[in-house]
Amino acid sequence: MGRTLEKVLIKNDDDIFSAEKGYILPNQIRCVEIEALVDTGASYLCLPPKVIKELGLRFAKSTPVKTGSGIYDLRIFKGAEITIKDRTIEMQVMENINDNVPPLIGYLVLEMMDWVVDPKNQTIMGNPLNDGKWVMDMY
């Protein structure tokens, strides 16, 4: 067992919409590719403040969050398109406490994309209950 790191591509969903409507060029879509630590104890995709600023994501709300060092009011941002391997979702992201905390891939992202952690190979893989295919739950 060890640390599982995965590449994540994050795009500003508002920019994607603007490019689709012809308001901006596709190469003007703000995006960042990062390596993030898979952390099944975290809820959201958690990003350093400088990455959120670079992406230009919209503030949604602040919420109390339990961390290993106590409870903090952290900010949630909307308008992120998240791609890991060949799967893409749109969801809110959480801002890390500071820029020194690494990006984290939380369990909500894993569940929405139907990924499971393979600790032996230090990677994520498609859910074996669904033969590795991306299958969503309705109930």
PLM feature segments, named:
Residues 1-139:
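Pepsin/retropepsin-fold aspartyl endopeptidases
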